[in-house]
């Protein structure tokens, strides 16, 4: 048994590599998360509950969650369409379009926020068109927040679904077509079940990123308490007031929400994979 266990450790320096990995993860992830708990411990349980459930904080939760959810649903649809076009069609400028998907990753979020704000204010061409034609204001409203979150979240869906579409075997689609299945039926019953786990993963990552987004939203949100104030901005306001205990308490709630989202994502992906495999 001892010899067998030794053979399993095929990577040279396994102990050292594992130690370095744990140290890096502790420095980057575990220690900062523990610091949130330590700072929030300065409040009593009653003070903690009062802080994280105050009307202004609850209103910021509502704005953050609703706009993040709306943007992520839009990204799920748009991201699937963009990934489908990039994989299934050939057209001039395809590589340029494919590369532009990465722009939200590379572009500083503050730059994105400023650009979106200038593009959607009532004095701009686009913002003025929606304002005067439809009576819709984009900048400094929840619509503007959603637009910013769509911008920063769509690459997560596209890059999650695109590799799966590229690896799909076209023989199944051909067989369905030969058997008389329509394109819509083939997509719903052949293609969509295969890409569903990737779509769920992309949606969840976009939602988690949108929930904590600050830089691109702060300029276009308007930041009006109870209306367009997002939770990350409220946390920043508490820090500027040197109210570190309240800031970390609110951040701890957002952290718990993020972990819950990741847990739900793992469960949904597992169930989707089992359904596709015919286990359930």
Where are these regions (language model features)?
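Membrane-water interface segments at the C-terminal ends of transmembrane alpha-helices
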Residues: 9-44, 53-166, 190-215, 219, ...
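The alpha-helix within a helix-turn-helix
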Residues: 176
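Short glycine/proline-centered loop/turn elements that form peptide/ligand docking sites
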Residues: 168-172, 278
């Amino acid at each position: 048994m001892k010899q067998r266990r030794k053979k399993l450790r095929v990577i040279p320096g396994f102990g050292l590599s594992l130690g370095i990995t744990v140290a890096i993860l502790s420095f980057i992830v575990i220690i900062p998360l523990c610091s949130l708990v330590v700072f929030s411990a300065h409040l009593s349980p009653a003070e903690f509950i009062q802080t994280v459930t105050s009307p202004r904080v609850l209103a910021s939760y509502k704005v953050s969650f609703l706009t993040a959810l709306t943007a992520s649903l839009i990204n799920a649809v748009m991201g699937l369409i963009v990934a489908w076009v990039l994989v299934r069609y050939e057209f001039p400028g395809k590589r340029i379009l494919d590369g532009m998907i990465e722009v939200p990753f590379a572009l500083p979020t503050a730059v994105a926020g400023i650009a979106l704000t200038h593009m959607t204010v009532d004095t701009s061409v686009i913002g003025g068109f929606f304002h005067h034609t439809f009576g819709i204001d984009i900048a400094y409203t929840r619509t503007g927040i959603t637009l910013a979150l769509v911008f920063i979240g769509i690459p997560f869906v596209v890059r999650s679904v695109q590799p799966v579409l590229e690896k799909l075997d076209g023989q199944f689609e051909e067989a369905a077509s030969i058997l008389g299945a329509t394109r819509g039926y083939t997509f719903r019953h052949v293609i969509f079940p295969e890409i569903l786990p990737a779509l769920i993963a992309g949606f969840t990552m976009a939602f988690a990123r949108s929930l904590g987004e600050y830089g691109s939203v702060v300029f276009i949100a308007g930041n009006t308490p109870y209306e367009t104030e997002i939770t990350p901005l409220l946390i920043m306001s508490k820090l500027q007031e040197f109210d570190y205990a309240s800031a970390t308490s609110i951040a701890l709630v957002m952290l718990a929400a993020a972990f819950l989202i990741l847990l739900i994502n793992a469960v949904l992906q597992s169930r989707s994979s089992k359904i596709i495999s015919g286990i359930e």
